Amino acid sequence: MFQQFKDTEYLLNAVTYGFWQNKKVYEFTDPDHICFNGNYAEAKSRLVSALVGGTLMLMSNDVENEDINKRILDLTSNNELLDIAREHITFVPIDESIDRDFASVFISENKKYMIIFNMTDTDRKICTSAKGIKPKIGEDLFTKVKIDLSATDCYELRARDCTVLRIVE
């Protein structure tokens, strides 16, 4: 079951290096079951890593827990996130994972979405400009805040957190 933070790293490693999959062997990669335990950022990262993986299979280890139940409702009520899974949008890694076993920045093949992960235990800025993608405006699907990506190529993320940006222009 996919419930530890290291499992999120494992999935990102698989999708970083597994893009030999071209829908001829398997139609979808397999993100495994997504659990919502741990803190909010970790649960969000598990959900978003499943989007990168290509499908969603949701479950939780304790849906009776009020905090986890709120987290489930919050994270799974974002229709645009669910549409990414429904539309089978494929993501590819766009950063070099020299010091890690996985990429931290992914772009959808249709260039409509960028996903950024901070898989460290500290808050940090993840920079994307060196990745060859130069979007101008991105909208964070979680906060609905628009970001001028032409003014900054770095995105501040809390420890073990992630975001999904819709590329506006």
Model-inferred region functions:
Residues M1-K144, Y155-V164:
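Active-site-proximal substrate-binding groove within the catalytic cores of carbohydrate-active enzymes
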Residues L165-E169:
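Short beta-strand-to-coil "C-cap" segments at the C-terminal boundary of structured domains/repeats
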